[in-house]
Every structure is written in C-alpha cells, then in structure tokens.
Design a protein with these regions (language model features):
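E1/E1-like adenylate-forming module used to activate ubiquitin-like modifiers
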Residues: 120-149
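Glycine-rich phosphate-binding loop and adjoining beta1-alpha1-beta2 segment
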Residues: 57-92
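Conserved S-adenosyl-L-methionine
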Residues: 48-52
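Short amphipathic alpha-helix with an adjacent loop that forms part of the alpha/beta core around
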Residues: 109-117
C-alpha cells in the first residue's frame, strides 16, 4: 500500500477493524449506470477506499445533469459519463483501478458486459426496468451481492 493510500484511507481500519477495512479495499464493485444515483455510488465507493471499480454507461454529460450528478460540471460537458467519473476519482484516489465500458445495458446484453468484470458486487443504477429485473434474478441465483436503488423493491439479494 502506498503512503498516500495509507494517509487517505488508513483511518478506515479504526472504524471497521483491519480485516473489515481490507475487505473494503480489496472489493471489486461494478456500477451499472453513472447518472444521478450511480455517480454518487461510485464516488462513495472510491472515497471509502475501494481499489477496483467498474463503470458501465453509454451516455455523455449534459447541462441537465449538472444539478444532480457529481461528475457533471461545465468542464465535463460532452464527456462520456464514465470518463468524467474516472477522471474525478483519479483526482482523489489515484490507487483506484477504474475500468470503464462505454455501453448501454439492456435485458439481453448485461450478462456479456458483466462477465468481463467478474465483480464481487454490482450496483444497478441503470434506467431500464427489464435490465434491472434480469440482473436481480441473476444475482439472486449467483449469490452475488447486488443492489438496485429504485422506488420498487427489486433490490438486495
């Protein structure tokens, strides 16, 4: 672990214990959809010391995103959301490996998209309900940690 990493995230050991903090540091989490929910989820994970993130989204930052998406600013207008988020994370957590996939997730293509990541956990923040239900069913069957912050409880398994 680098000295910078230790100074930035070492305090988590006092909060979660050595083993608990190490589980957070070693986690590989994929966030599907880097918009109003997903950008904040990715931010929280990176600021919590997670050292490997996967970000999946096809959209680009627009002015209408600025009021609710943490990576959206005048400087990032027109950038892909995944690149804007990766750039933001690199500014405060350079030890975080951020893998990006510039794809739209739907009910048919998500298994192939997630297969390349092999995550420990998936946060579903995509907009498409059919994709959400398909991913939730798969996660339950695979015993994979999965959450979908949504108004309907499709969520945790």
């Amino acid at each position: 672990m680098s000295a910078d990493f230790e100074r930035r995230f070492g305090g988590l050991r006092r909060l979660f214990g050595v083993a608990g903090a190490q589980r957070i540091f070693d986690a590989h989490v994929v966030v599907v959809g880097i918009g109003g929910v997903g950008s904040w989820a990715a931010e929280a994970l990176a600021r919590s010391g997670v050292r490997r993130l996967g970000l999946i989204d096809l959209d680009h930052v627009s002015e209408s995103n600025i009021n609710r998406q943490i990576h959206a600013s005048t400087a990032t207008l027109g950038m892909s959301k995944i690149d804007a988020m990766r750039q933001r994370i690199a500014g405060y957590h350079p030890d975080c490996q951020v893998d990006v996939l510039d794809e739209f997730v739907d009910a048919e293509n998500w298994p192939a998209l997630l297969q390349g990541f092999r995550p420990d956990a998936v946060i579903d923040a995509c907009d498409q309900i059919r994709a959400k239900t398909a991913m939730a069913a798969w996660a339950r069957q695979s015993c994979l940690l999965y959450t979908s912050p949504s108004p309907r409880d499709l969520s945790t398994s």
